[in-house]
Amino acid sequence: MKIETAASGKAFLSGEYMALDGGRAIILSTPQSAKVLISETNQTNNILVSSMSDHGYPFRIDEKLKIVWLKENPKQLGSILSEGISQFNKGFSGKSIAIDTSDFFCGERKIGIGSSAAVSAALTKALNKLLDLRLTSKAMI
């Protein structure tokens, strides 16, 4: 089993702060994208890996559908995954979740074009497939 998804970055042309209050904004998608790959492992625990880190973050999902980090907590990346599991109300085990945001960097410097939103969107699409939720694009928003 292998699930691959991607979501593009974004650049605001106008209305960035209006959008925060429910107003309208004009944005363009960018050629850079966040990529998520979910695959099977031979272990009972899961692991989260990211292009932004040189090590993995093993975790399990408890009976209350909360992530239990078995070593270090990956902070923001972990919170995006935790929110997805909470929203979908389903757990899983024995999976590797790889997040690649290397497109959003120039060398070691982040270029600032919506990588967090792209990770959220790509991860949501991947979890939708993994958990067989069959949500439409509109429902995932």
Language-model regions, residue ranges each:
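Alpha/beta catalytic cores of group-transfer enzymes, especially the acyltransferase/condensing modules
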Residues: 135-141
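ATP-binding N-lobe of GHMP and related small-molecule kinases
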Residues: 1-117, 125-135
